[in-house]
Amino acid sequence: FFKAMGADSAIEIIQNCTYKDYTEVGNSLDATSLDNMLAAIPYMKSINEYRKSVGLSELQVTYKLIAAAIANANYSDVKFGHSMQFDTSENLAWNYGTDPKPQWVDQEKAFFDQAVQELYGVTGLIGKDAADFYKSHSGIESYVNQHFKVAGYPATVGHYLHVISPEIGYMGMAVCSKGTMNGWKTDSFDTANLGWAGSGWNMNPISVDEYE
């Protein structure tokens, strides 16, 4: 696919990134498979629909970020955690093939809203207002860590805040369906900031519809 698109920087990532050995081109369950690349598109649309609903810009897609998400999804299919192999911001989710937005947004927004209300008596924050409030109030994440749990682990609001960041402008998303850990599918959502071109993540952006 990337070869057909002339996306040399994406090919470079797939072939030469730090954890390239976790990617198996030709494996139908690998994040490089066309089926799994197509499977990620509704999830990208879901993210953009939510951002639009709270007054934020929709994210554009770049092939380089898609490639980073592919490499990260394949790595995190095997290792429970972030690969840290790229200078992108990343959300990960493990599930049985469902949209990760409820994990990243719906669940964590509920934690965020409750923490903000209990700590500061504030309600109704969404979008940029929620992101800005978090930046100026340092106690929210630690409160959530201490008072909420997800599958036995301390909860976070970091994935939610990543999705609603006003600073990001570009994304890539990938699904690995090998199910190495507990039969889970692995979703990786990688982003780059608006106006930041240091590593070329924002080169030749297109809309999700154009990508599809």
Task: Indicate residue ranges for each PLM-predicted region.
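A well-ordered secondary-structure block
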Residues: 86-205
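Short, well-ordered surface patches within globular domains
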Residues: 1-90, 101, 160, 166-178
